[in-house]
Amino acid sequence: MKDRGLLAQVPEETRIALLTAAGRVSHPTRLESIKLSRAIRAQNRRRLDAQDRKTRASTTIRRTRAAGVFVAPARVLIGQAPQEERELQKPRFCYVCKAEFRKLHFFYDSMCPSCAEFNYAKRHQSAPLDGRVALVTGARIKIGYQTALMLLRAGAGVVATTRFPRDAALRYSREPDFNAWKDRLRIHGLDLRHFPSVELFTRYLTSSHERLDVLINNAAQTVRRPPGFYAHLLERETAPLTDEPPEIRALLESHEACVAALSVGAAKELGNGNAADVCGLALRGAKGPGMGLTHSAMLSQIKYTLDDALGEEVFPAGKTDADLQQVDLREKNSWRLTLAEVSSAEMLELQLINSVAPFILCSKLKPLMLRRPTNEKHIVNVSAMEGSFSRGTKTDKHPHTNMAKAALNMLTLTSAPDYAKSGIYMNAVDTGWVSDEDPALHAARKKDELDFQPPLDIVDGAARVCDPVFSGLLSGRHSWGIFFKDYKPAPW
């Protein structure tokens, strides 16, 4: 202050308070200095965090997620990628190699430049599959859907299974290049929980197909969804097939032929009155065999847990997510359950889907895979790090999922050497972290408070699934008996 005389114009009480405050600012106590330093550091952290959030939000993977519906971004060729430098204020650890990095790739926000370039190239990898046939389970949405698309675009014929075949057919028909591969796609309704139907399906494929080159055991249950989650799909799935447009009916012709074959077989009764099916399996008291094939969509409405009574309060009508799946507003789901909280029914059906069905498919489809010996056949069992015994960061949650994936890993490790003798190369693949399985409330909180988003998307997951097939055909060196994580062998 140049003229301290001005203080004389200030009331004495105010003047004393002002001088006292000025003195504390110029000569703070040690505690006040510490508090000020902490406040400044916190403000700087918030500023840097805000800058980094903005930088990460500019990557393609995040901009794609910001859209209401997921659409896989087109490939950006070398030389066409954005040239502006994206550099974080605070270093991060690479999702893949764990190295510290600051510079961001134009597409990925959680990888160092080297790993990002490698993963981006693998994301768009392909191989000539013309004339070959692949079976992909769980091919209606997410990784299974993208896997089927990759195989179709590589020239393969694809048999896709799902509990909701008409919804799947509609999704495929909306792809911009649908006309290029629609004649090579066949969609079958199949509920993998009903293991007699799985075996019936393998026998139908063996009798109706000349070859099978690739088996992708992708279908899996991680979070169990109550009947209300699927209720909106039933109207279409149960309507007369004639209501569907010709392009949808064409995709379902093979499924309808399978169901018709089962019906013919069921009409032939055994002497004891049980219904007989085309595969020699009798179902007591059944009107026909293979309910997992004939009524795959309706089986989703079986209720056996308390939350099966939940309705529109947690599954709001007309609300879907980026994968066009029903929004699930439950406060707790399977991903957060401990051992004592998992129902016996859920544990059993999860084992049927995640490990028993792949066992049946691998074993019963071997003759079909050997019908056209090429020494280039592949089985990919889609697994996860949750099934790895070498993983030291497991929590006490979802033990039933962990044990199912561990069983699938052991199936692969045990049988891969045997199948390799016949030119069938079996591997397990971890798809990587592509989605947040936590309940919607927790996922939203992590996104808002921590700016957390999974480091990969469903196309990255599909690329990892297809890699043993594509890499084997491109290089001529076919791997087997390996658990792949991020395209590289990982400990079991």
Task: Please describe what each predicted stretch is.
Residues 120-165:
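Canonical Rossmann dinucleotide-binding motif of NAD(H)/NADP(H)-dependent dehydrogenases/reductases
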Residues 136-137, 217-218, 248-251, 329-331, ...:
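Structural signature of the Rossmann-like NAD(P)-dependent dehydrogenase/reductase core
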Residues 154-172, 183-186, 214-217, 224-253:
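Conserved glycine-rich Rossmann-like NAD(P)H-binding loop of the short-chain dehydrogenase/reductase
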Residues 176-196, 277-294, 299-305, 310, ...:
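Rossmann-fold cofactor-recognition segment
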Residues 209, 414-424:
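Active-site-adjacent segment of SDR/Rossmann-fold oxidoreductases
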Residues 257-315, 445-492:
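C-terminal helical subdomain
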Residues 362, 404:
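Active-site helix of classical SDR
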